[in-house]
Each structure stands twice: as structure tokens, then as C-alpha cells.
Amino acid sequence: MYDCVIIGAGHNGLVCAHQLAKQGWKVLVLERRDLVGGACVTEELWPGFKVSTASYLVSLLLPEIEEEMQLARHGYRVLPRNPSSFTPGTDGRSLLLGPDLKQNQQQISQFSTRDAEQFPRYEAMLQKIAECLEPALMQTPPDLLPLPASWRSVGFRKKFRDTKTAYHLHQSLKHLGETIPEAIELLTGPALPILNRWFESDILKATLATDAIIGTFQPPSAPGTAYVLLHHVMGSAGGARGVWGYVEGGMGALSQAMAASAKAAGVEIRTGISVEEILISDQQISGVRLSTGETIATRSVASNADAHVTFEKLIPAGTLPETFEKAVSRIDYS
């Protein structure tokens, strides 16, 4: 019997597998596709040409994870992205932005002297908020959804963990000081009004708005898009704070390095295997059933699939509390 079966060999699943294996757990990772990585893969779409087919840049990978998994030892290399963006204009001018602040100001001054002066202040505001909030990324979030007492036992250890998390969040908010209003707007609001307040040139606002809506079908006027502006200055996987980078060999090289690290820690990884159901007996995880009909016994399951797949397709309806199932059904990924 396994201590944990992880559904999906995406980069999050591989990190989870490594962490559990380092604690002495017997871990099995099951991946539906024939290659690991999930959305972090390199594939040969045309003969002789390999590309990152989903995720294409790295920055938010935590340095702690990189060090613990010894990813460089397993072939992980990052090439800093410079320039970071190129925006052509309709009048023959263009905007080229990169990691050098003075060069950015020179570029922006083509379109607005005021915007060139504002840009360092805008970056500093994002930096301060990001630095205060980044420690929260390493904290286990508390359970905010009310659940029946019969579904999960809440012991002293969990209460202590939630209290500790709340304390760290309080400390982060305290350090925000007078930028708390801006932080709240960045975490919950749309990007467009923020950019409109800071800048006047459309080409700069359009370039920065890309950071807010990348990978979504939302306009920059949609609530929640402002948060992604913070990603522009968060992370340091590119070699310095806020620097994004390309992985040598494509994003799949990162997943391959993670898989190699996980295997070195004792993790078993099987590809080309689809999980059809998470088996539950007496309100406890008992195993998983594969598409082949085979069942694998395990004490726990960690799913790298999304919430809809995990709770609506892999677990029979009615197994979980109705309030939880309704909350999952309302999740909108668009």
C-alpha cells in the first residue's frame, strides 16, 4: 500500500511528491499522458522543432523549491528574458521594455515624459506590496469554507497551524502600512483603472495590461486582473527579483528535472495511466481505480488535476458535503 497516490505529474504534483518522499512516505505519481509536466512541457510540434506548448516562462518558482530539489543538478538552467516585451506602434515608433529601469524610462519618454517619471514609482509600489505578500505564498491557507464536523476532525495541531497562518498574514498586512488601500485594490480589483491613474500613454498601458490578462479570456477591466500585475515583480527564478526567464530546453526541461529529483527521493512515477475514480470507504480514502480496471490501495490522495475534475469527476456525487460540492461547481476558470 502507498502512503499517497498523486494524480497528475504536473510540476505541482512533482513538487508535492518530492516533499512527501523526503518525509519518508511511499509515493506513487500517476500521469494520464506519456510525458510528465502537465502544462509545463516541451513537445515537438513540427519535425525538428520543439517548443513549450503551454507555460513558456519561469519566475514564480520558489528558490526554496529549487534548492531543496537540487534542480540545477538535474539539468535545470534559466536564461533571463531580455527584453521582456516589444510593442510596435502604428506611427513607426515602438516600446521596448526590459530589466534596466533607465533604459525603460528612455523608451517610455518617447510617448510621455510624465509616464517616464511615474514608471519607477509604479514599480516601487508594486515591489513593496509584493515583498510584503510573498511570504504568504509559503503558508498553508486556513480553511474558510464551513464544513460539517463529521467530515473532518479539527485537532489542536490544525488549529495551531491556522492561527500561525493568520498571524503571518497579519504581519504581512501590517508591513504594508499606507499602501494597504493599493494592496487591496491590486488583490481584488481590475487592472485598467489602476493603469489609467498611473499613466497616460496608451502604448504603455496596453503593454503593462498584458501582464494582467495573460492566459485568460478577461479584459483588463475585469475584477481580479490587477492581481496579476503583481506577478510582474514577484519571483526570482530568473536570477533576480522580478526577472522572468526562459528554461533552457523549454519548460519541459524543468518538469524533467523535477521528475528526476522526485525519483532520486524514492518517488515512483507511471505515465500513460488514467485514474477513473478515487475510492472512498467509511469516509476514508482507500485507493484509486484506473481506466484499466486495476485498483491501487493508498492511505491518501493528492490531486494535481483541477477542482472540477477532482471533486466532480473522480469522486462520486453526494460523497462530499453539499456546501462543498456547490462551492466547487461555482469555480469559474474563464
Describe each PLM feature range.
Residues H11, G272-E276, T292-G293:
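Conserved SAM/SAH-binding loop
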Residues L35-A39, I214-F217, E277-L279, H308-E312:
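Flexible loop/turn segments at secondary-structure boundaries
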